[in-house]
Swiss-Prot record:
Record text on subunit structure and interactions: Part of the 50S ribosomal subunit.
One example GO MF annotation: rRNA binding
Protein name as it appears in the record: Large ribosomal subunit protein uL24
Function: One of two assembly initiator proteins, it binds directly to the 5'-end of the 23S rRNA, where it nucleates assembly of the 50S subunit.
GN (gene name): rplX
Family label: Belongs to the universal ribosomal protein uL24 family.
Membrane-spanning parts: none
Keyword line: Ribonucleoprotein, Ribosomal protein, RNA-binding, rRNA-binding
Length: 108
């Protein structure tokens, strides 16, 4: 069992801070804990040569390649820039991720 904790979750809006897609933003599609990676919608696109299978035609397909989790930061809609986050505990005991700059919650 993997006990890795990531600062991003599926569905979060993130900004890339390193690599060929630096300063671009996108939505997290999938978390890959074994590779310490995240798939971000429309970013880090690569071309794959796919063989025809069944009724699916073959050809060159563009798809997302994983980015290392250290190369993405949460994007705050209120601040309009990538920010670090911290954990706050609410009165009911629930933990939420909060923007360090403005205090806006990422967990709605």
């Amino acid at each position: 069992m993997l006990d890795k904790k990531f600062h991003v979750k599926k569905g979060d809006t993130v900004s890339v801070i390193a690599g060929k897609d630096k300063s671009k933003t996108g939505k997290v599609i999938r978390i890959l804990p074994k590779k310490d990676g995240v798939l971000v919608e429309g970013l880090n696109m690569v071309k794959r040569h796919m063989r025809a299978r069944g009724n699916e035609p073959g050809g060159i397909v563009e798809k997302e390649n994983p980015l290392h989790v250290s190369n993405v930061m949460l994007y705050c809609d209120k601040c309009k820039k990538p920010v670090r986050s911290k954990m706050n505990v609410l009165e009911d005991g629930k933990k939420v991720r909060v923007c360090i700059k403005c205090g806006d919650s990422f967990d709605k």
